[in-house]
Amino acid sequence: MTAQRNTLDAAITRSASALFAAQRPDGHWVFELEADATIPAEYILLRHYLGEPVDAALEAKIARYLRRIQSARHHGWPLYHDGAFDISATIKAYYALKMIGDAPDAPHMARARAAVLAAGGAEAGNVFPRIQLALYGAGPWSAVPTIPPELMLAPRWFPVHLSKI
């Protein structure tokens, strides 16, 4: 057990030393933030919704990233590397690529669309892509679930209190 403990302590010391060596003088670190498809897709969707000027170079990078992480196995986008198909992530990535300018009949887009349709269509996605699609007029607002405003008046012990949602 002592040998394992020494090995663990040495690994922790090496890891901490490597992190401290990478730390900037003002105390922060700069590392690549790897995310699933939803973060860059939502960024594109938000920029377009806000009417921000198109940054073609940035959009090209994001489009390449989204195309690169599309699953060859299920043709959609997972929530983590090599993960299972996630319909909501796939809807967002597909729509972001479409917004960037990828043709809907491009092979990667056709495969993604077929995967979404096979999983029940856009209506099978969670509330977030439904809201985004409704914002762009690509989906009905009636598909977005509503919360009755009276729930705000419910006491904390109530089973469906806002603090529990």
Map each language-model feature to its residues.
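Preference for long, amphipathic alpha-helical scaffolds in soluble/luminal domains
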Residues: 1-165
